Structure formats: structure tokens, C-alpha cells
């Protein structure tokens, strides 16, 4: 039998090893052996909750174990106050979405807001259009994007455009999305691939990542319910969003292609009514996905 002193030393050593091992093997939620992230949450996923209780919903995001977020507004809070709330919950805002007309009429104002929020990226997720998106609207948008990119770059922020499906209207030998890509300066304009809004208009995310290597710096990981109608409207019932791994997306191939193409940031965006229930399972799926 060991002496009390030796037993205490043995227990202390074992505890130290356990603590060291725990620290050395700790990982970020939502990442695993294959998928390394970094993964965050687009806060629009919880827009209904934020509209009722901003501090409480921010605490819920923290409770998911998430460390990074993408913004879609500040829910009537000044940027500095919203930033303080993020920081009090150990959350870091990487990127944010702003209205197209803000970029068109006063990109400097967007730059100042993004700077106040500590963002690395500021982007746009919808180009206003009437009826089917057309060439004139695509060219005009590209001009706005280049100008916004130049202004944001002066503040150390990168502009991005988030795909939304309607821009894949046929054009020449390709699509209007190809035209926007061709008309935007890679030094000033990056892209955020929303997987749902690539598959919805019957496009292939893997082929698009291969075609536009290094252009997509951000990605929305979003799954689609089996049987969801597909078209070029850029619109779909929000409840066609489902927990990652339960829909139609071929995640191993998509995530492998994203890594190879240089995607730097990934965000779960789930617009469904049950998003808060989906998010833990989606994070778990990313931890276990193999590619």
C-alpha cells in the first residue's frame, strides 16, 4: 500500500496529465478529423429569437459552443454596443451582410459600420431586380461591387457577394454569374458560396469551386430537404433548409473541394423555423464528416 504522501503525489500527477491531455486534444465545436473549419454561425438563422431578445439569443449562440459569427444587422443596436455584447459572450464577428443600396449610395457608411464591428469581410446577399435577373442588372451590380471593394479595402475590409440562385440565368456560353465574376476585380471582390443557392438553380458546387479557384473565401453550409423544387428565382420556403447531413447535399465532396479552392471561413446558415433545434446536430455532423 502506498503512503499517504506518495498517494497524494500520484493523484496530483495523474490529474495534471489528465488536464494537460484535455487541453492538448481540445478542439473547436463543429470541427473534426477531416473538416477543420473554422466554422461559425450566420446570426440570421436566429432572426426570430433576436427580434424578441438580443442578449438572451446571443447567450444561446455562445451555449452552442460557437466562437465565430456572421452578422445580418445589429437589431437596432449601435455597432459599438452590439460589438460589446458579442465580446461579452466571447464571440467574434468575422463578416456581415449589408443592403445592396447601401453599397450603391454610400459604401463609405458601410465601411465605417463594418470597421466599428471589427469585421474582416462585408458583403451583399441580394441584388434588387424585377422579374428575371438580366445582363444589365448584372453589369451594374459588378460596377457597384468593384467600387465597394475599393472603398472597403481602404479600411482593411474585403467585400464579398453571396450567391443567391437567380444569377445563374443563361448568358452566352455560361451564366450571368460568370459575367459578374468576369467583371469584378479579384483583388477587390471575393465571394461567399451558399451551397443551397448553388444547388437550387441546378448548379454543381464542386465544379464551380474548381472553376473559380481562390475566388470563394467564405461559404454558407446549408442543406436542402429532399424533393425541394429547384429554379432560378432565388426563393424557396425557409423550411426547405434542414439539419446538415439529412438533406441532398454531398458534403464530403463539397467540403474537400472547398478546402482545395481556398475557402477561409464557413458559416452554418439555417433559415428554417426549427433552426435552433438543427444547429447542434449540424455541428455534430461537421465533426464526424469524412473526406
Segment roles from a protein language model:
Residues 19-22:
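C-terminal motif of bacterial Sec signal peptides marking the signal peptidase cleavage site
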Residues 1-11:
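Bacterial N-terminal signal peptides that target proteins for export
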Residues 68, 75, 100-191, 276:
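Active-site acidic/histidine proton-transfer and metal-coordination neighborhood
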Residues 44-46, 72-74, 98-101, 127-129, ...:
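Active-site beta-loop-alpha junctions enriched in small/polar residues
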Residues 154-248:
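Acidic/histidine-rich catalytic cores of soluble enzymes
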Residues 2, 24-121, 214, 284, ...:
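N-terminal pre-domain/capping segments
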Residues 257, 272-291:
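Aromatic-rich peripheral "rim/lid" segments of glycoside hydrolase catalytic domains that contact
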Residues 37-42, 69-71, 93-98, 122-124, ...:
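Hydrophobic faces of well-ordered beta-strands that scaffold small-molecule active sites
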Amino acid at each position: 500500500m502506498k503512503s499517504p504522501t506518495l498517494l497524494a503525489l500520484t493523484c496530483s500527477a495523474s490529474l495534471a496529465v489528465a488536464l494537460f491531455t484535455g487541453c492538448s486534444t481540445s478542439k473547436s465545436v463543429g470541427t473534426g478529423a477531416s473538416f477543420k473549419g473554422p466554422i461559425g454561425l450566420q446570426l440570421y438563422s436566429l432572426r426570430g429569437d433576436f427580434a424578441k431578445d438580443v442578449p438572451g439569443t446571443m447567450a444561446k449562440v455562445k451555449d452552442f459552443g460557437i466562437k465565430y459569427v456572421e452578422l445580418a444587422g445589429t437589431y437596432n443596436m449601435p455597432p459599438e454596443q452590439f460589438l460589446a455584447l458579442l465580446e461579452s459572450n466571447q464571440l467574434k464577428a468575422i463578416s456581415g451582410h449589408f443592403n445592396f443600396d447601401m453599397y450603391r449610395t454610400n459604401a463609405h457608411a458601410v465601411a465605417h459600420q463594418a470597421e466599428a464591428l471589427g469585421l474582416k469581410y462585408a458583403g451583399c446577399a441580394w441584388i434588387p431586380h424585377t422579374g428575371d435577373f438580366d445582363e444589365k442588372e448584372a453589369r451594374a451590380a459588378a460596377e457597384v461591387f468593384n467600387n465597394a471593394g475599393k472603398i472597403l479595402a481602404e479600411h482593411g475590409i474585403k467585400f464579398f457577394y453571396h450567391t443567391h440562385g437567380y444569377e445563374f440565368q443563361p448568358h452566352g456560353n455560361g451564366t450571368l454569374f460568370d459575367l459578374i465574376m468576369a467583371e469584378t476585380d479579384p483583388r477587390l471582390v471575393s465571394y461567399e458560396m451558399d451551397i443551397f443557392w448553388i444547388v437550387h438553380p441546378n448548379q454543381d458546387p464542386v465544379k464551380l469551386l474548381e472553376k473559380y479557384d481562390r475566388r470563394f473565401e467564405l461559404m454558407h453550409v446549408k442543406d436542402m430537404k429532399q424533393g425541394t423544387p429547384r429554379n432560378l428565382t432565388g426563393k424557396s420556403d425557409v423550411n426547405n433548409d434542414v439539419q446538415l447531413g439529412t438533406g441532398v447535399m454531398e458534403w464530403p465532396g463539397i467540403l474537400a473541394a472547398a478546402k482545395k479552392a481556398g475557402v477561409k471561413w464557413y458559416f452554418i446558415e439555417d433559415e428554417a423555423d426549427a433552426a435552433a433545434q438543427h444547429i447542434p446536430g449540424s455541428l455534430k455532423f461537421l465533426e464526424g464528416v469524412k473526406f
